[in-house]
Amino acid sequence: MLSREIIEKTEVFLKRKFDAADYLNAHPEAKAYRIEHTYRVANIGRELALKEGFDETEMVIACLLHDVSYCEEFGEKGWIEHGRRAAHIARPFLSELGLAEDRINDICYGIAIHVDEKADFPGERTPFALSVGAADNIDRFDVFRIHETLTHDGFSSMGIDQKLEYCKKHLARLHKLIDEPMGTKTADEMWKARLSFQISFYEKLVRQFESRGLTRSMSKKGCSPDN
């Protein structure tokens, strides 16, 4: 059962950290994105917890705090270290909540390894710990991320040939990633479903662009595509 009181305390802690962050305050769009991403990951984590039998509250806490280190200025290695930094920031707060030490360590270990699967303290790669990173990864491939990625990469301003090459590169990457293990059966299923959707999307784009290329070729030869 979800403890609303503990979740609310975690939200207050996270908000306080983000509100005090110079970088996030100077870049409101980055702050809004980080908050939205955090809550999406928390919702995915809760779904994983319900289906895999994890403690809902602990999983939601872990997901809410997985990127809390964005309250700090990132140095040269800031991004690669942000999981480990988040774990260190979260640990004292989790102790204040009165959680058992073994549960604190499991939560912190999951947070620490969610970027590059490495921690700077002892821990186990339990299904619970792995699910923090799984929830984060699953969110990276939701439907809206397609729009965000295409917009960020300037897809609309590309020519047809560039778009075709772009889509093929994305397809190659998606096919490579789809069999990556996510730590639990539920996470594996969610991961494959999301990547399969994106694969279908990009395959349709490829067919459309290849069809346009064929149409242009026929036009140059004086043919009509209706013939």
Label for each model-derived stretch:
Residues I6-F13, F54-C63:
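Short coil-to-beta-strand
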Residues E96-E101, T151:
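Inter-helical turn/loop segments and adjacent helix faces that build the functional surface
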Residues S3-L24, H37:
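Short alpha-helical hairpin
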Residues Y23-P28, C71-E72:
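A short, mixed-charge helix-start or loop-turn motif at secondary-structure junctions
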Residues M1-E5, H27-F54, L65, K118-N227:
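Divalent metal-dependent phosphate-bond-processing catalytic cores, especially two-metal-ion Mg2+/Mn2+ enzymes
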Residues V41, E81-E96:
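An active-site-proximal "capping" alpha-helix that borders the catalytic cofactor pocket
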Residues E56-G78, H82, A86, I107-E117:
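His-Asp-centered metal-binding catalytic motifs of divalent-metal-dependent phosphohydrolases/nucleases
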